[in-house]
Amino acid sequence: MDQPAQRSAFAQRPTTTPVAASATARPLAGTGPLQAYGEWVVHLDGSPRSAERLALARRLAEVCGGRVVAMHAVTPIWTELPMSALGDGGAVVLLQQADEERQRAARRVYDAEAQRPGAPLAWSNGPAAEGGGRLMPAPARLAARALYADVVVLGQQDRDDPLTWGVPSDFVPAVVADSGRPALVVPRVGHQETIGRRVLVAWKASRESARALTSALPWLKTAQRVEIARWNEPGWRYGESRPDQHGTPPPSDAWLADWLQAHGITARITHEGDAGADIGELLLSRAADTDADLLVMGCYGHTRAREWLLGGATRTVLQSMTLPVWMAH
């Protein structure tokens, strides 16, 4: 990748030198609402599930008429250990070799997929190798590349696979928050035959839900069935969330239905009763009951000491999900 010229503030006039697009970039060839998703960035970690994520993203990008960019991003093993545990320089060398093997494994996944027909496919080394200085944390590196995409495809964490140990536990929320892009999170087990035909939306009157639902509108426009699930929650900030004593839905249900209808989407809105101890479990149960093949929800959480602390529903879904999840923060 070309690196921008170094210049101090106010020292030079803005450049008008054109920047050439990469060989795999092309005008969108898809039609319909899904054409909005033109560039897909896929996270590879060297694990076998990376191949599933990459193949799925490529299949979806082909439907959208877009392209896929694959990127390997993990935290180097040696940076996670205290200096006392590293001993002499030999230990660092061995750990660096292990990191290099993980990257080679990711590249093998990419090379194998590149041999198959499908949407245009490209490899990115990320900002650390494309003009960066010091080593960036893995989530920040991927988020920096995802800024220039429509969707970032991530995987559910699998602590039983040593090839994913370099993926921080808060990787998904950190990438979603730092990039501002919606994420398609793929389960660590199973194969997705269909996606986006039967959509379940977890709705809460919040910025996170609104952002997730808005970014998922192309999915909803092409879905065969859209269901929106709501739970009665205490401390409601944006109006009444539950039906009244006569069972009449709150006004916000009509607002939501009218907004979706303005986009040509007819959705069934259901009230699931009072929220239990963990809405995440209720949500996954509802997804199974309705045979949903895509769950749309906001990603809730906040940072503390550079680590993401997730809301209960978000944490549960990311831990126990068995279907693809579309998230936005």
Language-model-detected regions and their locations in the chain:
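P-loop/Walker A phosphate-binding loop and immediately adjacent motor/lid segment at beta-alpha junctions
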Residues: 108, 115, 122, 162-187, ...
